[in-house]
Amino acid sequence: RGLGDVYKRQVLMGICAVKSFGKKGKLAEIVLYYETVAFVCGIFFWLYAFYPDIKVTTFCKGAELACYDWLVILLMYYTQYSTGLFKGIRAVKIAMILFSAVDSFVMIANVWTHKVFTISEITNSDIIIEYVKDGFFYRAHFLYNYIVIVVILIAFIFMIAKASRFYSFRYEVIFITLFVGFILDLATVRSQSIYDISTLIYGFMSMIIYYLTLSYIPVSYTHLTLPTNREV
């Protein structure tokens, strides 16, 4: 069942990524990048969860963690282009991109260095991961991701309070999904379960973002987009 669920989610994420291609506008471009990275992250998750080789599993886990760095950046840019926030922090964005590049290298190289984590055993239901919890890169990775998520959540709270109903519904759905995922991730961070909450949430977020940004039209707005008899 778990394998089937992963297949279905990957197919849906792939469809969202393909359908995002060719859409016009900066926000649509950010959605395309987010969908693509989320899809690639899902592939690494699938290999991590179901390929029974410690070296491959270690590499895929590192690549999966590297994807998180770029997903939070893309989520920040999505927030910027959908809400208008985060425009005047160019230096911060450059610092985030540089950190993500270095962190991605460290996470992928972990398959040889084991500076962040080591996978000691793979069973049918568990993957035993031993994190280097006092290590700089372990702490920096998780602290960076959690801080960015908290900032984005605060931004959406601000926008929900001031936006019209048309936009507030979108912000509320994204906020609730991200907030629930954040809490679940904090609650299960020490779990040895194969299923990584972060990847599941980012995958679910990719489908919600695609739908709300490029597909969703409220019933009250359909008269603005449906063709009239004269147009038909």
Language-model region placement:
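Alpha-helical transmembrane segments in multipass membrane proteins, preferentially the mid-helix core
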Residues: M13-C16, L74-Y78, F142-R165, Y211-T213
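Membrane-interface helix-boundary motifs at transmembrane edges
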Residues: V18-V31, Q80-V92, I160-R170
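Conserved small/polar residues in nucleotide/adenosyl-binding loops
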Residues: G2-Q10, T222-T228
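Membrane-interfacial loop-to-transmembrane-helix junctions in polytopic alpha-helical membrane proteins
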Residues: K23-L27, D53-F59, G88-A91, K133-A140, ...
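Alpha-helical transmembrane segments of polytopic membrane proteins
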Residues: D5, K61-D69, F137-V148, T199-M205
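Interfacial "cap-and-anchor" motif at the non-cytosolic start of specific transmembrane alpha-helices
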Residues: F45, K162-L224
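Extracellular-loop-to-transmembrane junctions of the mid-late helices
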Residues: D5, A109-L153
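Hydrophobic alpha-helical transmembrane segments of multi-pass membrane proteins
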Residues: D5-D53, C60-Y77, M96-W112, I174-R190
